[in-house]
Amino acid sequence: MARLTHFDGDGQAHMVDVSGKAVTDRIAVADCYIKMTTQTLDLVEQGTAKKGDVLGVARLAGIMGAKKCADLIPLCHPLPITKVAVDLVPDASLPGVRITATVKTSGQTGVEMEALTAASTAALTVYDMLKAAEKTMEIGGLRVVLKDGGKSGRFEAPEGSAP
């Protein structure tokens, strides 16, 4: 089993020292979904939700979430993020919205947590904007689907492992 780097020899949590690591280009992609009724999805697609442009606001919230990751997760390093993209795609087969967040940096540590935070923040924002219409929405499937750059190399989630 891999050694957990966020704990010292005494088992105490600490922020990992990355000062000796090389600066490399890094990318992470995370995705999730939010399920809802077809009637609620219609509000999204027709732009008739009471709070406004659900997907546009959720996209911005996801971007903001990535930028605030180090403020939310105690042992994350503040990073010079060079790109955040959040894609929200209505999917009638769920029914709901599929969310993908891509984050890039050129730095000494990866951006997986920023991508996960972006995707989850976008999903939470969709919920917030639609909760007056439906309280039974379900957020799920949050995962890293791609991570590249740095010492550990490339990781891609197996195809077909998403709902």
Curated annotation (Swiss-Prot):
GO terms for biological process: Mo-molybdopterin cofactor biosynthetic process. Pathway: Cofactor biosynthesis; molybdopterin biosynthesis. Its EC number is 4.6.1.17. CDD domains: MoaC_PE. The active site is at residue 128. It is an enzyme of class 4 (lyase). Substrate binds at residues 75-77, 113-114. It holds the Pfam family MoaC. The keyword Lyase applies. GO terms for molecular function: cyclic pyranopterin monophosphate synthase activity. Keywords: Lyase, Molybdenum cofactor biosynthesis. It catalyses: (8S)-3',8-cyclo-7,8-dihydroguanosine 5'-triphosphate = cyclic pyranopterin phosphate + diphosphate. It comes from the Bacteria. Homohexamer; trimer of dimers. Belongs to the MoaC family. NCBIfam families: moaC, PRK09364.1. Catalyzes the conversion of (8S)-3',8-cyclo-7,8-dihydroguanosine 5'-triphosphate to cyclic pyranopterin monophosphate (cPMP). This is Cyclic pyranopterin monophosphate synthase. The lineage of its organism: Bacteria, Pseudomonadati, Pseudomonadota, Alphaproteobacteria, Rhodobacterales. The gene is moaC.
